[in-house]
């Protein structure tokens, strides 16, 4: 069994920024993202923006973030996700849980 070094574990941790467009406000989208994020051990937030989009900032293991991104692209049944812009960057460790705003 491989023993991971602190550096290797830290390198597996990432930050994801996503901006979700379409019918994503007033349809339970943020709660949907929060539920899946918590199940995947991801911390961060989902926030409604004035232009009708939703901003998601999430931190966790890269594999878990990729799974969350797939859920975001699907959205809950009442949502109509038209486009998701996203990027991955360096883990910052600034969140304690996953919030919605």
From Swiss-Prot:
GO terms for molecular function: acylphosphatase activity. Transmembrane segments: none annotated. Optimum pH is 4.7-5.7. Residues 15-101 form the Acylphosphatase-like domain. The keyword Hydrolase applies. Keywords: Hydrolase. The active site is at 30, 48. Pfam families: Acylphosphatase. It is an enzyme of class 3 (hydrolase). It catalyses: an acyl phosphate + H2O = a carboxylate + phosphate + H(+). InterPro entries: Acylphosphatase, Acylphosphatase-like_dom, Acylphosphatase-like_dom_sf, Acylphosphatase_CS. Optimum temperature is 81 degrees Celsius. Thermostable up to 100.8 degrees Celsius. Poorly active at 25 degrees Celsius. Enzymatic activity is increased 4-fold by temperature increase from 25 to 45 degrees Celsius and more than 9-fold at 98 degrees Celsius. Coiled coil: none annotated. Its EC number is 3.6.1.7. PANTHER family: ACYLPHOSPHATASE. Belongs to the acylphosphatase family. This is Acylphosphatase.
């Amino acid at each position: 069994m491989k023993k991971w070094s602190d550096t290797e574990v830290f390198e597996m941790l990432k930050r994801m920024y996503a901006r979700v467009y379409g019918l994503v406000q007033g349809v339970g989208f943020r709660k949907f993202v929060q539920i899946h994020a918590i199940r995947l051990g991801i911390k961060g937030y989902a926030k409604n923006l004035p232009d009708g989009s939703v901003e998601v900032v999430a931190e966790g293991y890269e594999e878990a973030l990729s799974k969350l991104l797939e859920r975001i692209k699907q959205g809950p049944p009442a949502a109509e996700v038209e486009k998701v812009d996203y990027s991955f960057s360096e883990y910052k460790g600034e969140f304690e849980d996953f919030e919605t705003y």
